[in-house]
Amino acid sequence: MNNFAVFILSNGRPDRVYTYETLRRHGYTGRIVLVVDDLDKTKDEYIEKYGSDVVVFDKRAAAKTFDQADNFDDMRAIVYARNACFDIAENLGVEYFMQLDDDYITFEWRFDNYNKYVPYRLIKRLDRVLSIMLEFFKSTDCATIAMAQGGDFIGGSDGTCARAPTLMRKAMN
């Protein structure tokens, strides 16, 4: 996975980038890039803590590349960073990337080998999981794929996602 990286999108909380350590704790050994905008007052703290793993993008320039669908000028949305990741990836020579928010505290399996719902089982070999996801992505015509999130399993074993696991038309974070 030499041409793959995980981008962690963060703003204003360099001391609470939980996702970085969570990735490592769950067995991800690949490249991690923290994506921070130039208007973030704490960007220097990110650089101090994470060094060359931080990429700072021009938020105003990013805003000019798409319809913001926003009548306000405060630019308090993650969409700027999400869209900037494509240029960042190209500049870094990264062909494939995963975007994550900065507050992930765990990666879990929700199904066993028999496709039976299990409420909680930690992923320990995240490198392997992401490698398989990347191979799946390459084998499809999909423009994006995503992992399920904890909220998808509200209701536990009686919830819709647990009773009838399937591909969903939803990608978040």
Q: Where do the protein language model's features map onto the residues?
A:
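N-proximal low-complexity "stem/linker" segments adjacent to membrane-targeting elements
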Residues: 1-27
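Conserved phosphate-coordination/catalytic loops
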Residues: 10, 14, 72-80, 120-127
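Short, solvent-exposed loop/turn segments at secondary-structure junctions
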Residues: 13-14, 62, 103-105, 150-153
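Short internal beta-strands
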Residues: 33-37
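Active-site-proximal specificity loops/subdomain of glycosyltransferases
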Residues: 38-98, 105-118
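A structural signal for short, well-ordered beta-strand segments and their strand-loop junctions
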Residues: 96-101, 144-148
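Conserved catalytic core of nucleotide-sugar-dependent glycosyltransferases
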Residues: 107-173
